[in-house]
Design a protein with these regions (language model features):
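Helix-loop-helix hairpin linking two adjacent transmembrane segments in secondary transporters
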Residues: 1-33
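A late C-terminal transmembrane helix in Major Facilitator Superfamily
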Residues: 173-210, 217-218
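Extracytoplasmic gate region of multi-pass secondary transporters
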Residues: 55-114, 197
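Intracellular juxtamembrane helix-capping segments at the cytosolic ends
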Residues: 161-174
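Flexible cytoplasmic inter-helical loops of multi-pass small-molecule transporters
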Residues: 29-48, 239-247
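C-terminal ends and interior cores of transmembrane alpha-helices
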Residues: 131-143
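Helix-to-loop junctions at the C-terminal end of transmembrane segments
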Residues: 108-120, 205-206
Length: 248
């Protein structure tokens, strides 16, 4: 990175992604046969009946959940380096913590996929949301160098798998012909949440000269996300036989 700077690095990443994703997208452009849509629609309609709410209301809830979870998630991701600088550890240590967090986020994304296959998207999202909230709380009580590395590792192990589970929930509960638009809306909400959360946390720091209230703000947004996901899980769990939802 030093020879080209962070701007050049980002530009290079963009070029690599465009060169890789566009050909891969063209390879998968063919639509599934109509019979596949009909089978999938029957399955999602039954699952939606278990939850007992309309597709539109469900989509609104998922958009709100996506926005709130990423508003919370953005606090450490955006401000961890500056936070370490304020604590006197230096921005280089903060960058190392952030790299550790992001690396474990990759592990989290893959691992969450295996977990979702076993217990379903909503249950996986609920676990990830809860543990992300726990990690945010830990940032409030531990500010030693070693402990911050540990907390950042915990945060990374659970935050990375949260966003992909929204696509799984959309696929499980929303009509297949609407899945593309639904996933696009929910993922867009997560991106807006990341932008808003990063800015708002910085604004809180500017007003209070402390990251403590910024972390508390993240905890509150995370609690809102957890409440939505737990409510969806509870509604389906109470309307299905024991264990049925966990293997959906």
């Amino acid at each position: 990175m030093p020879p080209i700077g962070w701007r050049g690095t980002y530009a290079g990443i963009g070029v690599i992604i465009a060169a890789a994703v566009l050909p891969l997208a063209l390879m998968m452009r063919r639509r599934p046969p109509a019979a596949v849509y009909e089978q999938a629609e029957a399955a999602t309609e039954a699952a939606r009946a278990d939850v007992g709410i309309s597709p539109r209301f469900l989509l609104i809830l998922l958009v709100l959940a996506g926005f709130s979870c990423c508003t919370a998630m953005s606090m450490p991701q955006v401000h961890l380096v500056a936070y370490c600088g304020d604590l006197g550890y230096g921005v280089a240590r903060g960058a190392q913590m952030l790299s550790l967090m992001m690396a474990l986020g990759i592990v989290s994304r893959i691992g969450s996929g295996f977990v979702a296959d076993a217990i379903g998207g909503a249950a996986t999202l609920m676990i990830g949301s809860f543990m992300q909230g726990v990690a945010l709380l830990l940032y409030l009580y531990f500010d030693g160098l070693e402990s911050l590395f540990v907390v950042s590792a915990i945060f990374g192990l659970f935050q990375g798998g949260i966003v992909p589970t929204y696509a799984i929930i959309c696929r499980e509960l929303l009509p297949p012909r609407q899945a593309g638009a639904a996933i696009g809306l929910v993922v867009s909400a997560t991106i807006l949440g990341m932008a808003f959360g990063g800015y708002f946390s910085g604004l809180i720091f500017d007003l209070t000269s402390s990251y403590r209230m910024a972390f508390l703000n993240g905890v509150m947004w995370n609690a809102f996300n957890f409440a939505i996901v737990a409510w969806l899980f509870w509604r389906r769990q109470r309307r299905t036989p024991a264990g049925a939802f966990m293997t959906a």
